Amino acid sequence: MTITAIASGKGGTGKTLVAVSLAHALAHLDERVLLCDADFGLANAGVHLGVSQCGDLKGVLDGTKALKDAVVRVESGRAGFDLLAAPSGVLATTGEAAVERLLTALQHAGHYDRVIVDLGAGVDANVMTLAARADEVLLVVTPDPASLTDAYAFAKILLRRTTSRVPYVLVNMAMNATEGRRIAEALLASARAFLRATPEFLGFIPLDPRVSDAVRRQRPLLTQFPQTPAATALEGIARKLHGQPAPVAAAGLR
């Protein structure tokens, strides 16, 4: 079982769309998937999916409910996945002990092939704890310069906590492949120079007006608009994750 954390240094990168889409795509690759919305302050995976029941993450965090009793099933075409979330804002004051309970539950969820954890944006303590304990971290950035700056800060803090978690980098909302690679290389060059680590560029998602259409309709992009460039890119990224090991860490920081 692999725990994949989806992270971003700032809000507005499309992180939750990526998490929801990868859950959908990996389920269609015959993985048994759990999507955990761990954005404790602003949970919205359920909104993206258009579901009214999103599970009982609060019960898992406070220790009153077992994971298997707290998830809900989301049907996704010929496949489906489980969802563990809570209404937005309900878990804004989640503490360290509750996060440890969640981690324990996820790490023992061996009946899944993959657990996708949609982290909160930024670098607060809960976010970094969850990222450091994941098996792999996918860091979502956009062409916005602030996104790059904050993504570098995220990678720096993560690597200071654990050098075994060199993140993948995924560029969202790129105009084309050239811009996607340019944005990724800017972040990778800084990481090589100052963090002595080489994150792996996982790919890019093109700027696509159908993405916002799917979000407004509260329908998953890959079922609502499966032939769009963004959907095709996300399916390709899922295939890479499905058969590709996490990048190897370098030794130390400076």
Where are these regions (language model features)?
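P-loop/Walker-type NTP enzyme "switch/lid" segment
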Residues: 35-113, 215-220
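Walker A/P-loop phosphate-binding motif and the immediately C-terminal alpha-helix
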Residues: 2-39
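G-domain G4 guanine-recognition motif of GTPases
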Residues: 9, 142, 167-182, 204-211
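NTP-binding/hydrolysis catalytic cores, primarily Walker-type P-loop NTPases
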Residues: 216-254
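Inter-motif core of Ras-like GTPase G domains
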Residues: 110, 124-146
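Gly/Ala-rich phosphate-binding loop of Rossmann-like dinucleotide-binding domains
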Residues: 27, 131, 159
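Beta-strand-loop-alpha "switch" segments that mediate conformational coupling across diverse proteins
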Residues: 195-222, 234
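Conserved C-terminal guanine-recognition region of P-loop GTPase G domains, centered on the G4
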Residues: 148-163
